[in-house]
Curated annotation (Swiss-Prot):
Low complexity composition bias: residue spans: 13-28
Record's protein name: Uncharacterized protein C17orf100
Feature: compositional bias, Basic and acidic residues: 29-49
Naturally occurring in which organism (per UniProt): Homo sapiens (Human)
Segments for region (Disordered): 1-118
Length: 118
């Protein structure tokens, strides 16, 4: 009977589960700003006053002249670059190997003992 039990053994069950997840996030931002400002102020003033006497005795006009010049130049350049790269990978592999043994014969033997006891 031992050979019959060995021959009746059921085939093993094999289960494999594979789960693969890949995620890639890439954010790239670029900003370029150029600002130029120029300011120019020019003031000129000429004033003529009453005549004055020269050493020779002639009358000469007196001239007062004022000149102002202001030049301002400003340049600003801003450049910003940002880069964010994120990559993640997840891989899960599960293998299940289950071999079933033939049904045990202890239960019918117990029933026979009950019948004998009655």
């Amino acid at each position: 009977m031992a050979s019959a039990r060995g021959a009746k053994q059921s085939s093993p069950r094999v289960g494999t589960t594979r789960y693969t997840e890949t995620s890639t996030v890439r954010v790239e931002t670029s900003s370029h700003r150029v600002e130029t400002s120029s300011r120019r102020v020019e003031t000129s003033q000429r004033r003529s006053e009453g005549p004055s006497l020269s050493p020779s005795g002639k009358r000469l006009p007196r001239i007062l002249e004022a000149s102002s010049r202001h030049v301002e130049s400003s340049s600003q350049r801003t450049e910003t670059t940002s880069r964010h790269v994120r990559a993640s990978s997840l891989r899960v592999e599960t293998s299940l190997h289950c071999a079933e043994s033939p049904t045990p014969r202890a239960k019918p033997a117990a029933r026979q003992n009950e019948k004998t006891a009655r």
